[in-house]
UniProtKB/Swiss-Prot annotation:
The modification N-acetylmethionine is found at residue 1. This is Myosin-binding protein C, cardiac-type. Zn(2+) binds at residues 212, 214, 227, 229. The modification Phosphoserine is found at residues 47, 279, 288, 307, 312, 427, 459, 550. SMART domains: FN3, IG, IGc2. One of its GO terms (cellular component) is cardiac myofibril. It holds the Pfam family I-set. Residues 95-153 are annotated as: Disordered. It comes from the Eukaryota. The keyword Chloroplast does not apply.
Length: 1274
């Protein structure tokens, strides 16, 4: 079955064959055409055959028959049948009748030997079934099972087959050979033959032990022989086969069947097998037992077998063209169609279907269709343009099958034959399929709207939380509704069943929320968009309570107020107050408060029963804050009047205790006094210490008593009763109060009581402690890939208490959130910070902590960026070595890092030495280097390191030492693969042939052409140390030839040959002539062109032109032969023919054309028209409708019309007031069927006047005139 995509070779589907008949009998020739109704002519020796007593002509649909009755020696000769442009020739041979005795003797032995051979038992069964004799030319099975064709089989002079494979039969286990012969005299290349079983199975993929394909070529007869060998045949080998032969421009195929019989012994012949029904009538194949009839045998089927065979072939329905069905079906239907038609080799079917040519129907409505797809950025404009064949055609634009209406965003444009759809401000809703419909045709395209990358405008912030706290990461992107992905340590986060992660969108803001953080949630979190990503670190710490301010011991008197206050790090922590280990229950006098991080216990009207140990225990933490309340009891003793004043304190006056107060707290000194009369209390503060002076011993003192040393102080009197520092005095006590103690309040306070009886004095030392001052800005050093060293100095003032440690914080430079790096206080003045993100700028600050609390933060450090050194370079190789140089080459490191690469350093050292010498001052950005000035013969090791702002990375070292010495390398040409075959270039094209070579030292390069050195300015040679180039700027035919390049080093050389072929367009064919004309066809012949353009002629293009119109139409394209038949011409017309030649460059510039027209005569009597005297139709011009006076309005187009007749057609001229209007662009002149029109565009009053129309031809001249008045509108 021929491939659907190929043009049929002949108009006949069945061709008449040459026959040999006995004299006196009848000869019948049959032919079948492609379609019914096609006119068929029979000829003998070039003369048409008409129906008479000798010849019988019959036509039935597509079937045409020629019968030659009572054949005699005179009837022997050449016959032909013509249908359309196809002509088939065949021969009739007449032989004398053979003696009847020889025929009987030839038949008798065959019938007697038939039952003796076991292999011929199936033939007996065939005879029992009523099988007819095999047709002429069929194959037969020999003793060894081979198939031999009939010696009398005629050759087919039209098809490609000289001998076609015939149907055959074989017994199970036997062998059979099918042969096909193809004539090769007219073929330029060997034909391609394929063997198929069924419709699809290509037997070339089944070649093995039981199936082999052979081919041979007989040079004497120029005949190709192709054979299909089937050995050890099985029942599965039976079926229909097909042989296909194809050349470059022809194709032919032949179907044949193979019947496989079961092996049956001579004594086991079962006559019942002759009456079993088979699945395929007439094929002789035995079916399975499931197809046999149960019950009695039907002997009538045996008698009707032969007739059923003959009728089944005639009544079989026409076979469906499966190729055409598959071509029109979608790929999803391939499997169903293959199943319906019994196709099992789906892979072979798809392979063959893919190789078929798809004949696309050329559009008649569109000259230029839409592209398959368009792409546009979101918010931009797109134009979809088509070009129509009819400029006046109406178009409709569809979007997803719905018609588009014109609006502000959709604009339709029509410019000539172009139709344009413009879509402005494209959005994602415009991403759809679009169609342009013109009448019944349409072209489709698809528009893809590309969104711009979504950028992150505000990055994520690092966070430090405790276990159980809520975490929320927030970022802001450039587009609302953008899709983002959240990742943790590189793994995408999803909404789990526990809803651990919650994602929130608010306009351009995106949030990742973790309700209760756990230790497993710590890590690096990232948000990723189409335009980038942002990273942040989450640190989760276990809860650890810190005490910023502990409770202190108190000493109060009766009826006073006692306040215990402490401050912890967590404001959500609650606690319990204990008194001597028992929980304290609040009442009207005892109050407990919790405000933020401050817990306070207040006791009003202190009594002696309140003196005890008080403790605060935070809930959930193993922590206990304790303090003691001292009750100062005032004892009232009876004293006589005139009692000297006395200050009653627990501490002796000579060595007073230091009273410590925290800055910002309230200081209250309650000093009990006594004396009668009531003493005067004086409070003083020592502000300046003077020089000490020596004093002699008091009078009456012992001699050995040493001199007392006294200090002289400048004292400040404190007597204010209101304000921050105040003194309140009653009869029995004096109270000194300082609100919000400050550092300036620190010092020695003197209390003096006086009355007439005497005085008493006590010194009280007050020390104010505070948080330390803020340390100086920390310094950053040793910055690594994800770590750095932070160093700082102690604070200038420690707050009066030793510094217990330091707290370190960091933040990203563009962020506002500081993240704490340590919970345990740092005792040292340096710390190594880790877990930073490479390439992100950070800042550091530090806090100092003492017993009072934490200082203010230090100024931020200078911004720094963690950057690690790059990795080591890879693939370090030695490219070349000379006596003093070594060429190195390497690749960049696999890990570059955020710091990029500043360059590479190269070093070398002697083998066995550890001292590396720099080979290059500074860094090189290239990945190769030529190290010069090396000692000859030295064995050196080389290493390369990559550098960036973080410093050098790891080195890569050559595996073995390199000997610095020139290596003698044999010259060798490395000819590229595409230069090993003939190099074809078109005339005028540049030629650039680059040939690499090897060899050391540098070889000498020599070019020659046809054995002669190259000369001339048009050919230039360029040589380098590694290659040579042959360059021709503009190629000419003279540059064709054989070029040889030679590389030589001393007595060693290597050669390569290149064949350059410069090709051009061929010259036109020669000597075109008309060989024969018959019916509606003309046979042409020509000779190949004299100049083939220096390349093979690919074919010819044949064109025809009617003598009347001289419009050329292509009849044949890429036609290989030098003769052809042009058919389907019109009777009575004359035609010119011309032929172009083609090669790989193109078609010839000129064509070979017939000089005289070829007329297609009408069959039958030739009509001779009567001769008449020619009439003279010439006539002088005359106006049948003259011009009329008109009055028009200015600004509106006006038309002047008249009608003229004349022969030949007169020349028309228009005048205004005697001036010719032919070159004035404001006037348009028309002439159609004798009607003359003058159009005046937007006339003005100046256009008024007398207009004249003049008509002139060879016979005379005529003119008419009118007056035109142009009125101005009022």
């Amino acid at each position: 079955m021929p491939e659907p995509g190929k043009r049929p070779v002949s108009a006949f589907t069945k061709k008449p064959r040459s026959v040999e008949v006995t004299a006196g009998s009848a000869a019948v020739f049959e032919a079948e055409t492609e379609r019914s109704g096609l006119k068929v002519q029979w000829q003998r020796d070039g003369s048409d055959i008409a129906a008479n007593d000798k010849y019988g002509l019959a036509a039935e649909g597509k079937r045409h028959t020629l019968t030659v009755r009572d054949v005699g020696p005179d009837d022997q000769g050449s016959y032909a049948v013509i249908a359309g442009s196809s002509k088939v020739k065949f021969d009739l041979k007449v032989t004398e009748p053979a003696p009847p005795e020889k025929a009987e003797s030839a038949v008798a032995p065959t019938s007697m030997e038939a039952p003796e051979t076991p292999k011929e038992v199936p033939a007996l069964a065939t005879q029992l079934e009523g099988n007819v004799s095999s047709p002429e030319g069929s194959v037969s099975v020999t003793q060894d099972g081979s198939v031999a064709g009939s010696q009398g089989a005629p050759d087919d002079p039209i098809g490609l087959f000289l001998m076609r494979p015939q149907d055959g039969e074989v017994t199970v286990g036997g062998s059979i050979v099918f042969s096909a012969r193809v004539a090769g005299a007219s073929l330029l290349k060997p034909p391609v033959v394929k063997w198929f079983k069924g419709k699809w199975v290509d037997l070339s993929s089944k070649v093995g032990q039981h199936l082999q394909l052979h081919d041979s070529y007989d040079r004497a007869s120029k005949v190709y022989l192709f054979e299909l060998h089937i050995t050890d045949a099985q029942a599965t080998s039976a079926g229909g086969y097909r042989c296909e032969v194809s050349t470059k421009d022809k194709f032919d195929s032949c179907n044949f069947n193979l019947t496989v019989h079961e092996a049956i012994g001579s004594g086991d012949l079962d006559l019942r097998s002759a009456f079993r029904r088979t699945s395929l009538a007439g094929t002789g194949r035995r079916t399975s037992d499931s197809h046999e009839d149960a019950g009695t045998l039907d002997f009538s089927s045996l008698l009707k077998k032969s007739s059923f065979r003959r009728d089944s072939k005639l009544e079989a329905p026409a076979e469906e063209d499966v190729w055409e069905i598959l071509r029109q079906a979608p790929p999803s239907e391939y499997e169903r169609i293959a199943f319906q038609h019994g196709v099992t080799d789906l892979r072979g079917m798809l392979k063959r279907l893919k190789g078929m040519k798809h004949d696309e129907k050329k559009s008649t409505a569109f000259q230029k269709k839409l592209e398959p797809a368009y792409q546009v950025n979101k918010g931009h404009k797109i134009r979809l343009t088509v070009e129509l064949a009819d400029p006046d055609a109406e178009v409709k634009w569809l979007k997803n099958g719905q018609e588009i209406q014109m609006s502000g965003r959709y604009i339709f444009e029509s410019i000539g034959a172009k139709r344009t759809l413009t879509i402005s401000q494209c959005s994602l809703a415009d991403d759809a399929a679009y169609q342009c419909v013109v009448g019944g045709e349409k072209c489709s395209t698809e528009l893809f709207v590309k969104e711009p990358p979504v950028l992150i405008t505000r990055s994520l912030e690092d966070q430090l939380v405790m276990v159980g706290q809520r975490v929320e990461f927030e970022c802001e992107v450039s587009e609302e509704g953008a899709q983002v992905k959240w990742l943790k340590d590189g793994v995408e986060l999803t909404r789990e069943e526990t809803f651990k992660y919650r994602f929130k969108k608010d306009g351009r803001k995106h949030h990742l929320i973790i309700n209760e953080a756990t230790l497993e949630d710590a890590g690096h979190y990232a948000v990723r968009t189409s335009g980038g990503q942002a990273l942040a670190e989450l640190i989760v710490q276990e809860k650890k309570l810190e005490v910023y301010q502990s409770i202190a011991d108190l000493a109060v008197g009766a009826k006073d107020q006692a306040v215990f206050k402490c401050e912890v790090s967590d404001e959500n922590v609650r606690g319990v107050w204990l008194k001597n280990g028992k929980e304290l229950v609040p009442d009207n006098r005892i109050k407990v408060s919790h405000i933020g991080r401050v817990h306070k216990l207040t006791i009003d009207d202190v009594t002696p029963a309140d003196e005890a140990d008080y403790s605060f225990v935070p809930e959930g933490f193993a922590c206990n804050l304790s303090a003691k309340l001292h009750f100062m009891e005032v004892k009232i003793d009876f004293v006589p009047r005139q009692e000297p004043p006395k200050i009653h304190l627990d501490c002796p006056g000579s060595t007073p205790d230091t009273i410590v107060v925290v800055a910002g707290n309230k200081l209250r000194l309650d000093v009990p006094i006594s004396g009668d009369p009531a003493p005067t209390v004086i409070w003083q503060k020592t502000i300046t210490q003077g020089k000490k002076a020596s004093a002699g011993p008091p009078p009456g003192a012992p001699e050995d008593a040493g001199a007392d040393e006294e200090w002289v102080f400048d004292k400040k009197l404190l007597c204010e009763t209101e304000g921050r520092v105040r003194v309140e005095t009653t009869k029995d006590r004096s109270v000194f109060t300082v609100e919000g103690a400050e550092k300036e309040d620190e010092g020695v306070y003197t209390v003096t009581v006086k009355n007439p009886v005497g005085e008493d004095q006590v010194n009280l030392t007050v020390k104010v402690i505070d948080v330390p001052d803020a340390p100086a800005a920390p310094k950053i050093s040793n910055v690594g890939e994800d770590s750095c060293i932070v160093q700082w100095e102690p604070p200038a003032y420690d707050g009066g208490q030793p510094v217990l440690g330091y707290i370190l914080e960091r933040k990203k430079k563009k962020s506002y959130r500081w993240m704490r790096l340590n919970f345990d206080l740092l005792r040292e003045l340096s710390h190594e910070a880790r877990r930073m993100i490479e390439g992100v700028a950070y800042e550091m600050r530090v806090y100092a902590v003492n017993a009072v609390g934490m200082s203010r933060p230090s100024p931020a450090s200078q911004p720094f960026m963690p950057i690690g050194p790059p990795g080591e370079p890879t693939h370090l190789t030695v490219e070349d070595v000379s006596d003093t140089t070594v060429s190195l080459k390497w690749r960049p490191p696999e890990r570059v890092g955020a710091g990029g690469l500043d360059g590479y350093s190269v070093e070398y050292c002697q083998e066995g030495c550890s001292e590396w010498v720099t080979a290059l001052q500074g860094l090189t950005e290239r990945t190769s280097l030529l190290v010069k000035d090396l000692p000859t013969g030295a064995r050196l090791l080389f290493r390369v390191r990559a550098h960036n702002v973080a410093g050098p990375g790891g080195p890569i070292i050559t595996k073995e030492p390199v000997t610095v010495q020139e290596i003698l390398q044999r010259p060798r040409l490395q000819l590229p693969r595409h230069l090993r075959q003939t190099i074809q270039k078109k005339v005028g094209e540049p030629v650039n042939l680059l040939i690499p070579f090897q060899g050391k030292p540098r070889p000498q390069v020599t070019w020659t052409k046809e054995g002669q050195p190259l000369a001339g300015e048009e050919v230039s040679i360029r040589n380098s140390p590694t290659d040579t180039i042959l360059f021709i700027r503009a190629a000419h035919r003279t540059h064709s030839g054989t070029y040889q390049v030679t590389v030589r080093i001393e007595n060693m050389e290597d050669k390569a040959t290149l064949v350059l072929q410069i090709v051009d367009k061929p010259s036109p064919p020669l000597d075109i002539r008309v060989v024969e004309t018959w019916g509606f066809s003309v046979a042409l012949e020509w000779k190949p062109p004299q100049d083939d353009g220096n390349t093979e002629i690919w074919g010819y293009t044949v064109q025809k032109a009617d003598k009347k119109t001289m419009e050329w139409f292509t009849v044949l394209e890429h036609y290989r032969q030098t003769h052809c038949v042009v058919s389907e011409l019109i009777i009575g017309n004359g035609y010119y023919f011309r032929v172009f030649s083609h090669n790989m460059v193109g078609s010839s510039d000129r064509a070979a054309a017939t000089k005289e027209p070829i007329f297609i005569p009408r069959p039958g009597i030739t009509y001779e028209p009567p001769k008449y005297k020619a009439l003279d139709f010439s006539e002088a011009p005359s106006f049948t409708q003259p011009l009329t006076n008109r009055s028009i309005i200015a600004g509106y187009n006006a038309i002047l019309c008249c009608a003229v007749r004349g022969s030949p057609k007169p020349k028309i001229s228009w005048f205004k007031n005697g001036l010719d209007l032919g070159e004035d662009a404001r006037f348009r002149m028309f002439c159609k069927q004798g009607v003359l029109t003058l159009e005046i565009r937007k006339p003005c009053p100046y256009d008024g006047g007398v207009y004249v129309c003049r008509a002139t031809n060879l016979q005379g001249e005529a003119q008419c005139e009118c007056r035109l008045e142009v009125r101005v509108p009022q």
